[in-house]
Amino acid sequence: MSATSTLIVKARARSWESIHSVALTCPAQTLKQAAEITCYCSRKRKRFQRKKRKGSLPLSNVTRIGPGAWQISHPFLGENEIIGSYLLAGQNELAIIDPGPGSMVESLLESIREAGFDPQEVTHILITHVHLDHAGSAGTLVRQLPKAQVYTHKKGAPHLLDTTKVVASASRIYGERMKLLWGEIESTPQERLSIIEGGDILNIAGRRLEVHYTPGHAIHHVVFFDVHSGELFAGDVAGVRLQDVDYVRPPTPPPDLDLEAWSDSISLVKSLRPDVLYIGHFGAIKNIAEHFDRLREKLSSWGEFVLGAMRDGKEEAEIISMLIEHTKPELLRAARDPHAIERYEIATNYPMTVQGYMRYWRKKHPERL
């Protein structure tokens, strides 16, 4: 198998991003590679489980980012600083923003303790969007945290209220790897779920958080903006930029990708003039205008690249290979570490990137094909 083909298989095997969506729209060729994927994931799983048994698994990394605020790095498959949550504390309330996947529940609870709090005192779980890497643990957490109420956009609520279809679809794709990757995916009881929309104000943990609707990456995406501190919790609307790597990558999974809506969401966030963005993948961004300019350019240029390949009659697998070869050199120059490619693949992988763009062009702009 070529290096490029191997990367594609790895990316398919580690489709963390938006699995609740992809499980319902997964193309046939993804499933046809199941044997190769299973072999790769089996090796990865065994290495990961050996680390757990030996006690060498990286621990959660809890960092205080300001008064009453902590950043939590989950050790997802042994890799830190790829998936993050945020903890807010104040006025006898504890709020978690994007609690992460179900496989990281114990990591999250231990991180809250490490920050000096009792997880049983968590009162609010705020969801930027309901993709499993951000919100997969919500249903499990409300069963363990008696005071916690979940807040999500109305378009994301059905995915949390009933996860039966999501679990069944994802299980067909991941099989025995399902629990390792995502843990338990439990439904959230209706009485423990509150609906939020753009324009709402949440007075939580001593903060006044504005809710802004920011579709583009997902139709159920919102951000939370603290006007007084200037902190904006951005989910995935600000893209992916891992720590110590000056490289922005667009996470464009199906089925909700909408480039026009995303551009409008970027303009909205910039108009708020936040002092810092806290993103899910991963951490703080302070050069906000430059960051969004790069993201907007990448969203457009990668989309045009995929469109050009579709016009040339290329199939999905070939377009994935082409996009990898087209974009990999820039990431390597920015990271100076080949391992950065795999880390970015965990956060958002090439197959889903291409699938998202292909669906977007076919659904939104068939006249350009």
Residue ranges with predicted function:
Residues 64, 101-103, 159-213, 219-289:
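Metallo-beta-lactamase
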Residues 59-115, 224-234:
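Conserved beta-strand hairpin/beta-sheet module of binuclear metal-dependent hydrolase folds
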